């Protein structure tokens, strides 16, 4: 009875306590895994520049290599989603690590475009398997929305860190960072539950039943929205640093802007969390879409200083 009467900060702290006490080890390793698994995605501006400046790829080739890497990430995640309830999760993670490490290791030796193209697909596929298990762990937690918020907040810091560190490394150095981060997961595989634990299913009210047909379509609408969002991200995020450097912008300024833009996403996550707690999910989403559309529109129509 006391828990139901809590509001505001007290309720938020109680939710955090429940989430952490549920299975903090599994949550911790899943958080690490999702940050490493999405490492190429969030660091793609820096990595794309490295492919051009250090390996001599053209901008068209960079787009294809990045597309293969992220396409592999998607393919690995889809395959894992099909089998995750029937296969030991530790085995799935271990297989993903092996594939990603071997593919990244071969990239140390092979630098020609055709070979790198397929090696990046394999690396992405392994990352997709690895990351899909981590995302599933968040989804099966006792407070999934809070767990995903934690993931988004953490992305801001990991992305800023990548933007700061990766430009200082050689191409092989970047590959070694990913190899080391994947291998560092192995000692903690025992923290991952082999199979999802069952939770009691809550009874649905008659109000929910009346909206059942909408509930069936809602996940697919959300997936389609995510699909379109990531197409937009891929369209500019791969080339954002290359485009800035091509226009003779100071490289140090470009690096600083990317770092601070990453940290600003932390503020966006905080505002979205506060708004969603008070007004639900729709209004923060509409505000975010309007803000992004306005920003891209300003850039498209000549704001370049």
Regions of interest found by a model, annotated:
Residues 44-45, 217-259:
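Extracytoplasmic gate region of multi-pass secondary transporters
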Residues 91-105, 283-298:
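Structural signature of the two symmetry-related core transmembrane helices
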């Amino acid at each position: 009875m006391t828990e139901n009467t809590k509001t505001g900060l007290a309720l938020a702290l109680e939710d955090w306590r429940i989430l952490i006490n549920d299975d903090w080890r599994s949550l911790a390793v899943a958080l690490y895994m999702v940050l490493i698994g999405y490492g190429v995605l969030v660091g793609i501006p820096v990595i794309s520049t490295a492919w051009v400046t250090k390996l001599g790829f053209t901008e068209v080739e960079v787009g294809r290599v990045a597309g293969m890497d992220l396409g592999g990430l998607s393919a690995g995640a889809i395959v894992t989603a099909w089998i995750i309830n029937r296969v030991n999760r530790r085995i799935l993670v271990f297989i993903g690590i092996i594939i990603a490490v071997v593919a990244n290791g071969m990239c140390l030796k092979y630098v020609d475009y055709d070979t790198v193209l397929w090696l990046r697909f394999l690396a992405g596929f392994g990352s997709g398997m690895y990351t899909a298990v981590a995302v599933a762990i968040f989804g099966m937690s006792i407070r999934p929305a809070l767990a995903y918020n934690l993931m988004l907040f953490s992305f801001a810091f990991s992305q800023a860190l990548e933007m700061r560190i990766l430009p200082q490394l050689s191409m092989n150095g970047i590959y070694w960072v990913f190899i080391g981060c994947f291998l560092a997961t192995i000692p903690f595989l025992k923290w991952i539950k082999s199979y999802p634990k069952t939770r009691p299913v809550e009874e649905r009210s008659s109000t929910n039943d009346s909206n059942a047909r909408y509930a069936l379509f809602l996940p697919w609408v959300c997936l389609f929205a995510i699909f379109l969002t990531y197409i937009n991200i891929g369209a500019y995020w791969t080339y954002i640093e290359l485009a800035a450097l091509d226009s003779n912008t100071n490289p140090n300024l470009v690096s600083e802007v990317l770092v601070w833009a990453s940290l600003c996403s932390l503020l966006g996550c905080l505002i979205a969390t506060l708004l969603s707690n008070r007004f639900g999910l729709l209004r923060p989403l509409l505000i975010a879409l309007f803000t992004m559309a306005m920003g891209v529109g300003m850039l498209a129509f000549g704001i370049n200083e």
